[in-house]
Amino acid sequence: MRNRAIKSFSICICQIFIIYFIFFLLLCVNRICSALSNGFNFLIIYGGTFFHSGKYSIPILDVDHQLNGNSSLGTVGLYFHVPFTPPDIIPPVPRSPNNMFLCFFSSIVFASAFVFSFIVNNVCKDFLFLSLNSGFSFTGYITGLYPLYRISRVSSLASKYCVVGTLGSDLKS
């Protein structure tokens, strides 16, 4: 029984490192593509609010800004952004069971990324585009770190797409 618990814990640790590795690969790809004529980038939507830096150069994560108005705090979506396309014109992602693995995997990735960002925020902030300020609390992230198998309606804009992860609870009334 003890050996089984140790083995399970080891597998869990390995999975976390694999997730971090994939996250950093995505980050590197994003940075390289941004430098090369704003190629394919990753776009994060928080309750229908787009965050971007430069001319359609979009980092993987950018939570340095306060969310506007009646957005749903804590809801994260992962999308591909076509170069030189305005951020508000994005092909919708079909809501189908085929996306459930993407929803689950993205939830794990972003949850791990935010916890990791809490540790390295002051060291690598400029490189990672990660921050836990602007009204977000670390407690909110911890209580909201759970895999998500549902598609959340977060706003009239974001509800058109597949929301693939949730960090924290929706605060939209």
From Swiss-Prot:
The chain crosses the membrane at residues 9-29, 32-52, 100-120, 127-147. The keyword Transmembrane applies. It is found in: Membrane. GO terms for cellular component: membrane. The keyword Calcium does not apply. Its main location: membrane. Keywords: Membrane, Transmembrane, Transmembrane helix. It is a multi-pass membrane protein. Almost completely overlaps SUE1. This is Putative uncharacterized protein YPR150W. It comes from Saccharomyces cerevisiae (strain ATCC 204508 / S288c) (Baker's yeast). The lineage of its organism: Eukaryota, Fungi, Dikarya, Ascomycota, Saccharomycotina.
